[in-house]
Amino acid sequence: MAESHRLYVKGKHISYQRSKSVTNPNVSLIQIEGVASPKDAKFYLGKRIAYVYRAPKEIRGSKIRVIWGKVTRTHGNNGLVRANFKKNLPPKTFGASVRIMLYPSNI
């Protein structure tokens, strides 16, 4: 039997990019599991992110939907990354789990 390989790493949607008074919902801040420094986070630049959720209405035989995004750059000194999604993630996803795909590979 073939050996299974990891296709993604788990992460959490922390917040939008923001200043003291202005929030920017175009840019989401993501904390990746096991990443604690900007040096480690650089590996994930350009990787695809999927927010997978279950919707009440079935479309084309499935209630599962996905919002896709991409890691654009690091954020701060704790290993957070900034990500842009095709459609902005709604605020109810703060704290929700996202999948950071291990492709496209840059090694």
Curated annotation (Swiss-Prot):
Keyword annotations from UniProtKB, A to Z: Cytoplasm, Ribonucleoprotein, Ribosomal protein
Entry-linked InterPro entries: Ribosomal_eL33, Ribosomal_eL33_CS, Ribosomal_eL33_sf, Transl_B-barrel_sf
Biological processes annotated in GO: cytoplasmic translation; ribosomal large subunit biogenesis
GO molecular function: structural constituent of ribosome
One GO CC term, this protein: cytosolic large ribosomal subunit
Pfam families noted in UniProt: Ribosomal_L35Ae
Location in or out of the cell: Cytoplasm
Main location: cytoplasm
Self-association state and partner proteins as the record states: Component of the large ribosomal subunit. Mature ribosomes consist of a small (40S) and a large (60S) subunit. The 40S subunit contains about 32 different proteins and 1 molecule of RNA (18S). The 60S subunit contains 45 different proteins and 3 molecules of RNA (25S, 5.8S and 5S).
HAMAP family: Ribosomal_eL33
Biological role: Component of the ribosome, a large ribonucleoprotein complex responsible for the synthesis of proteins in the cell. The small ribosomal subunit (SSU) binds messenger RNAs (mRNAs) and translates the encoded message by selecting cognate aminoacyl-transfer RNA (tRNA) molecules. The large subunit (LSU) contains the ribosomal catalytic site termed the peptidyl transferase center (PTC), which catalyzes the formation of peptide bonds, thereby polymerizing the amino acids delivered by tRNAs into a polypeptide chain.
Family: Belongs to the eukaryotic ribosomal protein eL33 family.
Protein name (Swiss-Prot/TrEMBL): Large ribosomal subunit protein eL33
Gene: RPL33A
